[in-house]
Amino acid sequence: MKIAILIRHGESDINVKGILSDTIDNNMLTEKGMRQAEHAAAELKGIDIKNFYSSPIKRAFDTAQIIADSFNKDVVTDQRLIEIGLGKARGRKANEFTNGLYSGHITGKIREDLEMEKWDSLQKRVVEAIASREGINVYVTHSDPIRAAISYFLEMGEEETYGLSIKNASMTVIDVEIGRILTLGAISMTDSVRKYLNIQ
């Protein structure tokens, strides 16, 4: 059994400012972000989680720590869970790179112009991380790495999954062995998902 519970970090101060960052920084969770992490921890109660893994970036690690503390477990950092390489977009605002019609992800050819990490590279490292461990494990990471994992199992590219918006502290559950996506950016663990996890 290989079940991955992918959780985006809670709201951070740079989320509020709209700034992009892929570095191991000192950006903090907001008070709201900490409450979001506590909510995720409460939703995971009763699930037999083996281990907790996190991107080394502070906003993700702090989220993972809040959740893992409620299970009396440690957090292990995994470089493969780090934010997408942002290239020339690092430290800038995402809305600088949209055409005014749409907001959200940086998409299409502009990603190449900004020398961002290639989507297939991001997919490869994230999927390797979640496929390498047995049991039910939690992986706290960032929006694009989660979107990349989802797009991998849906056999889609970056542009085909532009509309996927992974909210702060939301949970995406994937049965990695069979490629089944059980939740997509959920904020609660439903009875049907709990039942599935408990019978694996």
From Swiss-Prot:
Gene3D superfamilies on file: Phosphoglycerate mutase-like
Pathway participation: Carbohydrate degradation; glycolysis; pyruvate from D-glyceraldehyde 3-phosphate: step 3/5
Annotated catalysed reactions: (2R)-2-phosphoglycerate = (2R)-3-phosphoglycerate
EC numbers: 5.4.2.11
Matching SMART domains: PGAM
Protein's job: Catalyzes the interconversion of 2-phosphoglycerate and 3-phosphoglycerate.
Record's protein name: 2,3-bisphosphoglycerate-dependent phosphoglycerate mutase
Organism: Thermoplasma acidophilum (strain ATCC 25905 / DSM 1728 / JCM 9062 / NBRC 15155 / AMRC-C165)
